[in-house]
Structures are given as structure tokens and as C-alpha cells.
Design a protein with these regions (language model features):
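Glycine-rich beta-to-alpha transition loops that act as phosphate-gripper elements at the mouths
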Residues: 95-99
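Active-site-proximal gating segment of KS-fold condensing enzymes and close homologs
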Residues: 74-78
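Short secondary-structure boundary/capping segments
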Residues: 7-8, 83-85
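Basic/polar N-terminal segments that are highly enriched at the extreme N-terminus
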Residues: 1-7
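A structural preference for short, pocket-lining loop segments at secondary-structure junctions
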Residues: 12-20, 31-72, 85-94, 112, ...
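CoA-thioester-processing core
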Residues: 80, 84, 100-136
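Short, solvent-exposed loop/turn segments at secondary-structure boundaries
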Residues: 29-30, 127
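Glycine-rich acyl-CoA binding loop
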Residues: 25, 29, 103
Length: 136
């Protein structure tokens, strides 16, 4: 069995969901998208009142889709709060380092984004005239 790539911690009715794949700069793999969807479902069913979405490591919040193991089942949109997972609790994204492509979409579907001085947002799809449907 593969080690979890999403962690869920709860304290004082505040959930912290962490993308935990720093060795791959938190690239969004199929496993990660599945676990993230499950974490948001857990949040919805819990007594937690708010969620902080963050990422492990110091180089990237996430570099977007993992090109060697892209999200396919479920698709990337299925882990987006309020789109693929219905939530009535606020999600606060805490961003550091690179935030690229699908990760940028994930941040945009959060209720609030807080970025530190290292944050670098980039949506490469726009450079080639493609929008994956999440931002459009």
C-alpha cells in the first residue's frame, strides 16, 4: 500500500489538510486527488468549523498535475471545494512557493487565500490558449 499523501489534523474545530508530497513538489497525482477529495468529505462530515489547506516542504504549495501520474480517476475537478466536493465550511489556502496549474485552481476555489512572500502563481495553460474548464 502506498503511503498517504494528504494528512488531516483537527484541533479546536480547525482542520488542517496538508498536501504531503514534497519530494515531488506536491504534484497532483491520481492518489493525491482521491485523498484530497476524501479529506474534504471528512471535513464536511466533521465538527470542524474551518479548514486550512497547506502543503509540506518549502519549495512549492504544488506544481500542478503530476505529468507521470496525472489525475484521471477521479478527475482533478472532483477534489475542488464547492465543485467536486460540496462544502459549507470555509477553506483557507495557505500558499508558499510555486502554485501552478491545477493547484492554482484549487486555491481559487478556496474561500480565502493567504500567500507568503515566496508564493509564485502560474497558470501555464493560458500561454497556449487552453483553459481546462476550471477557471473559465
Amino acid at each position: 500500500m502506498t503511503a498517504p499523501v494528504i494528512t488531516y489534523e483537527s484541533k479546536d474545530q480547525i482542520a488542517t489538510i496538508t498536501i504531503n508530497r514534497p519530494e515531488k513538489m506536491n504534484a497532483l497525482s491520481n492518489q493525491l486527488v482521491l485523498e484530497l477529495r476524501e479529506a474534504f468529505q471528512r471535513l464536511q462530515e466533521s465538527d470542524d468549523r474551518v479548514c486550512v489547506l497547506t502543503a509540506a516542504g518549502d519549495r512549492a504549495f504544488s506544481v500542478g498535475a503530476d505529468l507521470k501520474d496525472p489525475p484521471r480517476n477521479p478527475d482533478l475537478w472532483e477534489c475542488m471545494p464547492g465543485v467536486g466536493v460540496m462544502l459549507d465550511k470555509p477553506v483557507i489556502a495557505a500558499i508558499h512557493g510555486y502554485c501552478v496549474g491545477g493547484a492554482y485552481c484549487l486555491v481559487q476555489f478556496s474561500d480565502l487565500a493567504v500567500a507568503d512572500e515566496t508564493a509564485d502563481f502560474f497558470y501555464p495553460e493560458a500561454q497556449i490558449g487552453f483553459c481546462g474548464g476550471l477557471i473559465a
